């Protein structure tokens, strides 16, 4: 029996469900390692349990998140992904079928074709926001995202001109849509995608050491907050944009609900 077309939101649920395949003939699996730090740790734990406790041999492949990953799982080229943030995976709505449940509460019902299966969640709750150093928040008097425009010059660079700069969600394939969110909220900042989590964090660390103001997309839990004193600007809660008005053809300008794009829940 081959475990295929399967994705786990987070590892613990994956391991528990995988245990039911204990009599499987095929003992080799291919795992997609997420391209962010937490995902790498998640996969290390999952693979260790599969190999040391269940006798599988697991080949790990670093695979960028996004639609391509889901398609590879659906095609059987990859057996499972160790971790996925569901509200950042736009392909899930067409590939998964069934409820997404957190703490006994149904957050979303997928109505896709079922080519990718969600095995469950581990109970880890993630939160994404835009963060600034506490020293900048206190010196500039920034208490929420609504205060950012008043001080955008402090966050501007030669490349952004008069606009402030956001060290954005670094990978386009993560589908964060930071520039769309900034524009919908009227925040006059430019989202700068640096390509990797490491690059974005390195630039933030350098700015912190220089005691410069900067705005950073990041998520919790993350090791960065244990090393540096940061404050979230408190982005608004998730709202679903009207699919008839919030379109690529319309340059994603009209959300229909005056909210931010459907890419981040308070709980993820």
State each model region's role.
Residues 1-11:
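Bacterial N-terminal signal peptides that target proteins for export
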Residues 9-19:
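Bacterial N-terminal signal peptides
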Residues 26-38, 56-62, 163-167:
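Short, well-ordered beta-strand elements
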Residues 36-37, 57-71, 192-203:
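Short helix-initiation/N-cap motifs at beta->coil->alpha
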Residues 37-56, 180-182:
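Short, polar/charged alpha-helical segment
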Residues 66-131:
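N-terminal segment of the mature folded domain
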Residues 87, 97-117, 181-185, 191-268:
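Flexible, solvent-exposed loop/hinge segments that line or gate ligand/substrate-binding clefts
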Residues 106-166:
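A conserved helix-loop-strand patch within extracytoplasmic ligand-binding domains
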């Amino acid at each position: 029996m081959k475990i295929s077309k399967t994705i786990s939101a987070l590892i613990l649920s994956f391991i528990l469900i995988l245990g039911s395949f204990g009599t499987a003939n095929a003992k080799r699996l291919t795992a997609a390692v997420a391209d962010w730090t937490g995902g790498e740790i998640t996969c290390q734990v999952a693979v260790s349990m599969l190999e040391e406790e269940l006798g599988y041999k697991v080949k790990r492949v670093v695979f960028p998140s996004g639609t391509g990953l889901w398609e590879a799982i659906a095609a059987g080229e990859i057996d499972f992904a160790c971790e996925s943030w569901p509200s950042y995976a736009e392909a899930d709505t067409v590939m998964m079928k069934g409820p997404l449940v957190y703490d006994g509460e149904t957050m979303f019902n997928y109505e896709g074709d079922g080519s990718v299966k969600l095995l469950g969640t581990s109970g880890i709750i993630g939160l994404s926001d835009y963060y600034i150093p506490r020293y900048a928040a206190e010196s500039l008097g920034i208490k929420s995202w609504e205060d950012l425009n008043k001080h955008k010059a402090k966050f501007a660079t030669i490349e952004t001109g008069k606009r402030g700069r956001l060290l954005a969600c670094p990978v386009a394939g993560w589908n964060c849509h930071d520039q769309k969110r900034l524009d919908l909220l009227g925040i006059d900042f430019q989202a700068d995608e640096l390509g990797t989590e490491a690059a974005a964090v390195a630039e933030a660390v350098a700015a912190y050491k220089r005691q410069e103001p900067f705005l950073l997309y990041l998520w919790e839990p993350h090791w960065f907050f244990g090393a540096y004193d940061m404050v979230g600007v408190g982005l608004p809660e998730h709202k679903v944009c009207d699919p008839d008005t919030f379109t690529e053809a319309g340059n994603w300008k009209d959300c229909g609900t005056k909210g931010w794009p459907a890419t981040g829940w308070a709980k993820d």
